[in-house]
A protein has these predicted regions:
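A short, solvent-exposed, low-complexity linear motif enriched for acidic/polar residues
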Residues: 9-254
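C-terminal motif of bacterial Sec signal peptides marking the signal peptidase cleavage site
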Residues: 3-6
Length: 254
């Protein structure tokens, strides 16, 4: 079983979990009006380029929730790193535990913060284990995590196999500065969709990510011009785009 399926399994010493409930964050993905299907479905990006997607994975971390009184609950760091993998349905519903209350906002990072990027490998467990769950989300040559990965094919790609690969990482660097592609996502809940958790009461937050926004928004990204993007300046353009790919669909309180 993958360690990133439920934060609640990673109790943090010194925190009282007796009056806590679960919040499930349910991720779905679309390409415009179409549900995302990996493999054979053809989509068209805002540049008019046809493409197919074979992989979509990204880290979420540093999750927090804001109550109606304005106070903020930050999920303990050792319990808030997840890999969202569209090909693995079990990864699309990470679970966190929070104190009872009503929450009007949530926030999370797409990526892995600089502290965890620089910790000793022995302290990177679960979703952060570069020899396990994060094996294909880690640059061994750069000692850093891939925050967001989208791969596929397109007839306009200049690559011999017509592939495209977007592997976006970089946290600002340690001894030498780099681009910082860590992005914070802020989600506001409408009054009818406030998260209400309490004793024997859990909630599910439904979020939708539109992959077409990876190609547009602040920056126009053409597969013909940018078929492979990794640790290059164009990575910042893609990160700025996917920072706006998420919308809140609804909240259920059970």
């Amino acid at each position: 079983m993958f360690a990133f399926l439920s934060c609640s399994k990673n109790a943090v010493e010194g925190i009282d979990y007796s009056n806590r409930s679960r919040i499930t964050i349910s991720f779905s993905h679309v390409a415009g009006e179409k549900d995302l299907s990996l493999g054979n479905t053809t989509y068209v990006n805002p540049s008019g380029e046809e493409f197919k997607v074979t992989a979509l994975k990204y880290f979420i971390s540093n999750i927090s929730f804001t109550k109606t009184d304005g106070s903020v609950y930050v999920v303990p760091q050792d319990s808030c790193y997840f890999i969202i993998d569209h090909s693995q349905s079990s990864s699309l519903t990470p679970i966190v535990t929070t104190p009872a209350g009503q929450y009007t906002k949530m926030s999370f990072l797409i990526g892995v913060d600089s502290l965890r990027n620089t910790k000793d490998i022995s302290q990177r467990l679960g979703a952060l284990d570069p020899t396990g769950s994060a094996a294909d989300m880690y640059w061994t040559w750069n000692s850093g995590y891939i925050f967001f990965k989208m791969e596929g094919s397109s007839p306009v790609s200049p690559q011999t196999d017509k592939s495209f690969r977007y592997h976006i990482g970089l946290y600002g660097g340690n001894s030498s500065g780099t681009i910082n592609n860590i992005k914070r996502i802020n989600i506001n809940f409408s009054p009818e969709n406030i998260v209400k958790v309490g004793e024997a009461k859990n909630s599910t937050i439904y979020l939708k990510g539109d992959i077409l926004k990876v190609f547009s928004g602040k920056n126009n990204i053409s597969i013909a011009s940018n078929s492979v993007v990794m640790a290059t300046p164009n990575s910042a353009s893609i990160a700025e785009n996917y920072a706006n790919m998420f919308t809140h669909v609804k909240t259920t309180n059970d």
